[in-house]
Amino acid sequence: MKFTKTEARKRRHFRVRHKVVGTAERPRLNVFKSNTNFYAQIIDDTKGVTLVSASTLKMDLKSKSNIQAAEKVAEELTKKALAANINQVVFDRNGYLYHGKIKAFAQKARENGLKF
């Protein structure tokens, strides 16, 4: 039985979520990409609370779903995270391959000061 791209991503994410857990000391950095926007949030899984979030929904960009948009979201998210005294996170790529937008997002977040 062949899986679609979305089903395969969800299966990968399900497997990874058993291993990746965000705590108060090291919350989980989760990313999601749709056809039109890019979203990222930092989550404390022990409390079930989103600590910081950023997305392209409110940004004024020419294209909200390309690599440059993902880098802008990374800049905004790291700025908010460092202001909230969050330095270390666990990266949850949500089943996506570490390539393209996800890779650009992660590299920009590391450049701006997040450790993962």
Curated annotation (Swiss-Prot):
The keyword rRNA-binding applies. GO terms for cellular component: cytosolic large ribosomal subunit. The keyword RNA-binding applies. Keywords: Ribonucleoprotein, Ribosomal protein, RNA-binding, rRNA-binding. GO terms for molecular function: 5S rRNA binding; structural constituent of ribosome. This is one of the proteins that bind and probably mediate the attachment of the 5S RNA into the large ribosomal subunit, where it forms part of the central protuberance. Belongs to the universal ribosomal protein uL18 family. This is Large ribosomal subunit protein uL18. It comes from Mycoplasma capricolum subsp. capricolum (strain California kid / ATCC 27343 / NCTC 10154). Part of the 50S ribosomal subunit; part of the 5S rRNA/L5/L18/L25 subcomplex. Contacts the 5S and 23S rRNAs. InterPro entries: Ribosomal_uL18_bac-type (IPR004389), Ribosomal_uL18_bac/euk (IPR005484). GO terms for biological process: translation. SUPFAM superfamilies: Translational machinery components. It comes from the Bacteria.
